[in-house]
Amino acid sequence: MNIFEHSIKNVDKGNVVAIVGTQWGDEGKGKIIDILSKYSDITCRFNGGGNAGHTICVGNKKHALHLLPCGVLYENNINILGNCMVIHLKTLMKEINNLGNNILDRIYISEKAHILFDIHQEIDAIQETRKSKDGNAIGTTKKGIGPCYSTKASRIGIRMGSLRNFENFKKLYIKLIDNLMDLYNIKDYNKEEELNEFYTYHKILKDKIINIISYINKSIDSKKYILIEGANAAMLDIDLGTYPFVTSSSTTLGGIFSGLGIHHKKLNLVVGVVKSYLTRVGSGPFLTEQCNEIGEYLTKKGFEYGTTTNRPRRCGWLDLPMLFYVKYINCIDIINLTKLDVLSGLKEIYVCVDYKNKTTGELLERGSYPLEDEQLREYEPVYEKFEGWDEDITNCIEFDELPENAKKYVLTIESYIKTPIVWVGVGPTRDNTITRKFD
């Protein structure tokens, strides 16, 4: 389905579609982004850094992307790394080199994106070690994301635009690194070696660093199709997620406008990606977590191991109150439900439909969400039970081919969140996706 032509048929707006994760990440955004990239002219990433990861399965080959947008897999697609990203250039160049085929010709990097240095990763590990001693570790990927955003917020960070003039970059670099070494008592850091690496990056990338705001808006005005891919997910948003167990950037709809510099009226469709069950990496509250054989089953069958860290993900039942809250804050228009096939073989499936206060027995108002850890501990999940199914659904290509219990599961989710589920993922590849009609 060409979602761009479908979505703008009766809407006098821009040709812009956004994909956002609705949970704690790892929902399977990469696959739907990959599918839709076929129809887009430009694919944009607006936030985050190498802590995110998309795994794209094309035939028997897997592509793990941490910084590059998924559009790089299509030769007709321009790919943009946005303003609010933090970019570890060693990681970026590794991804570019792994893909080959003149990928660099189709990549542009915002001059406003911040550079993530190796010292940011060292600081991340130092901070996490200190927190773990007090039992307050966040469970970060140790990719340096938080420290890089910290230097950005402190206005001492270095932006990609500075790399175009290497002599000026060198002065900024020495000042920043000396500052951070002193602040964190880092005695041994090879500045000369890193500067040599960055001189290479300067020569390779200086013409790829541009004003993306102008580029994207001119593209929208000329009726190009723009696909926006979110990294991480809504419940990891620095402001709207389960703080402090969040990432360091805005992962929700609002982050798009600063991350790419486009007007909100230019955005005409928001796709929310929902996994059929729930997972989380690292620390933080998780009301529906299953620390039992069900959790182990979901981890193994769903191959729930982090793209970035390879850590096993915590697994549990789908949480609809959370999903309803995320729909509110992202203005989600349609849903892509993923990994329904993982639930095949379970005799019973549970879905959280309400949060009940442990003391008063009152149910949480739909659309609100207690984001603080201590607030969440006041509630317990209220479940609805569904009968499972044994059939292998990976070869289903139409919704009506699904077992009745699987269809009931999907339709119940759709009814609860009052948002059409357009795509249903029934396996790992592009072809394992059921497309339903929507108005």
Curated annotation (Swiss-Prot):
Its EC number is 6.3.4.4. Pathway: Purine metabolism; AMP biosynthesis via de novo pathway; AMP from IMP: step 1/2. InterPro entries: Adenylosuccin_syn_GTP-bd (IPR018220), Adenylosuccin_syn_Lys_AS (IPR033128), Adenylosuccinate_synth_dom1 (IPR042109), Adenylosuccinate_synth_dom2 (IPR042110), Adenylosuccinate_synth_dom3 (IPR042111), Adenylosuccinate_synthetase (IPR001114), P-loop_NTPase (IPR027417). It holds the Pfam family Adenylsucc_synt. GO terms for biological process: 'de novo' AMP biosynthetic process; IMP metabolic process. Binds 1 Mg(2+) ion per subunit. The active site is at 26 (proton acceptor), 54 (proton donor). GO terms for molecular function: adenylosuccinate synthase activity; GTP binding; magnesium ion binding. It catalyses: IMP + L-aspartate + GTP = N(6)-(1,2-dicarboxyethyl)-AMP + GDP + phosphate + 2 H(+). IMP binds at residues 26-29, 51-54, 141, 155, 232, 247, 311. Mg(2+) binds at residues 26, 53. SMART domains: Adenylsucc_synt (SM00788). GTP binds at residues 25-31, 53-55, 62, 307, 313, 339-341, 425-427. Disulfide bonds: none annotated. The keyword Aminoacyl-tRNA synthetase does not apply. Keywords: Cytoplasm, GTP-binding, Ligase, Magnesium, Metal-binding, Nucleotide-binding, Purine biosynthesis. It is found in: Cytoplasm. Belongs to the adenylosuccinate synthetase family. NCBIfam families: PRK01117.1, purA. This is Adenylosuccinate synthetase.
